[in-house]
């Protein structure tokens, strides 16, 4: 929650202004693997530009350097794996811009990003160092089958002789509201 650069949110550890730059340190995260599943309301890895001090966050929002810290189990680097910040704030990419660096002294992965004021939702994922494979949440976030996701279903039709598909229907489904008892 980076909507204010005057007041610290519950996820901020510290906030300092150095010269013309606001430095924000997010509270360190640890592995959630093996912990009981807890539903956290989220925005599925997205972000929204918002500011509590202005009317229009696109014009009046400020920027800050934000330090993210992830402590792996035993404070040891994952063998053969890189840890990445994963979400819309890194364009869901597993590249050098999202890769966290392991700090041997602290025993933690760290990454600093220059972000505009807003609300950011993200996860930590691992990717093989050989760059082949898919993001894996199980080492960092745990693997919980009962999580909430949003799906968009698009139905296309291509008439005989046509050169392009036509969108004839769409719907949005949320797995959270499909489960009994919710």
Where on the chain are the PLM-derived regions?
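Basic K/R-rich, polyanion-interacting modules in nucleoproteins and related proteins
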Residues: 24-81, 167-182
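Long, internal scaffold/assembly segments composed of regular secondary structure
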Residues: 1-38
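Generic serine detector
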Residues: 4, 9, 14, 46, ...
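Aromatic-rich carbohydrate-binding modules that target alpha-glucans
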Residues: 67-117, 129-159
């Amino acid at each position: 929650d980076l909507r204010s650069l005057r007041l610290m949110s519950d996820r901020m550890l510290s906030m300092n202004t150095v010269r013309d730059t606001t430095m924000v340190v997010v509270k360190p995260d640890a592995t959630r693997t093996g912990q009981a599943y807890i539903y956290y309301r989220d925005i599925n890895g997205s972000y929204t530009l918002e500011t509590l001090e202005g009317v229009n966050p696109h014009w009046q929002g400020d920027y800050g350097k934000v330090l993210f810290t992830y402590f792996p189990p035993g404070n040891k680097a994952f063998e053969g794996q890189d840890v990445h910040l994963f979400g819309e704030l890194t364009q869901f990419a597993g590249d050098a811009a999202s890769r966290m660096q392991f700090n041997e002294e602290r025993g933690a992965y760290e990454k600093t990003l220059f972000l505009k004021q807003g609300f950011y939702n993200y996860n930590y994922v691992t990717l093989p160092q050989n760059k082949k494979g898919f993001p894996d949440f199980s080492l960092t976030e745990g693997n919980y089958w009962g999580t909430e996701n949003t799906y968009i279903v698009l139905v296309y039709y291509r008439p005989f002789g046509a050169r392009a598909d036509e969108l004839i229907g769409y719907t949005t489904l949320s797995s959270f509201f499909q489960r009994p008892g919710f």
